[in-house]
């Protein structure tokens, strides 16, 4: 089959819309995942027995199941279990990214906190700060700097994971590509264009994250 460039140009506006949806889902999902991950990570590191084990169960369940199963459970199974619950595809996608990324960010948080030398914690306590003030004003700022590279990697993973939400009909980049192919039957050209879009997004994001890392001078 000969590659037909003319099949790509009419598809670009729809692919751009799909790329916007992909980014929007990943940004909202990762923002929520950061909150979940920080809470679960601190529960694992500083929490009591109950908080530690609740966070551990959450992390192991989410990391031990495929993201496709998670989104199918949220979108199809939960409304069947709760008759009054209605979840649209976009909400299901965002919530899935939140929960999925949150489990991984929890371990990123835990690793970053544990990597901070205990001398910083001792110094905070010696200055009269309480345990939680030391965590908030001393440990957390240092840990966040060390978390930046793996968080950036998690964002890129989440962007690519959105392609799996084609199973619930979210109009993200992969879904838009599929819809275009259903109309023009040019799979080679359209999937090539979709791949280029993903590559552009991840390369730009990687470049921005590298610049941020250099500016923050990771400790």
Swiss-Prot record:
Keywords: Amino-acid transport, Cell inner membrane, Cell membrane, Membrane, Transmembrane, Transmembrane helix, Transport. PROSITE patterns: ABC_TM1. GO terms for cellular component: ATP-binding cassette (ABC) transporter complex, substrate-binding subunit-containing; membrane; plasma membrane. The chain crosses the membrane at residues 23-43, 54-74, 89-109, 151-171, 188-208. It is found in: Cell inner membrane. GO terms for molecular function: L-glutamine transmembrane transporter activity. Induction: By lack of glutamine. Pfam families: BPD_transp_1 (PF00528). InterPro entries: AA_ABC_transptr_permease_3TM (IPR010065), ArtM/GltK/GlnP/TcyL/YhdX-like (IPR043429), MetI-like (IPR000515), MetI-like_sf (IPR035906). Residues 44-53, 110-150, 209-219 are cytoplasmic. It is a multi-pass membrane protein. Residues 1-22, 75-88, 172-187 are periplasmic. It comes from the Bacteria. Part of the binding-protein-dependent transport system for glutamine; probably responsible for the translocation of the substrate across the membrane. NCBIfam families: HEQRo_perm_3TM, PRK09494.1. This is Glutamine transport system permease protein GlnP. The gene is glnP.
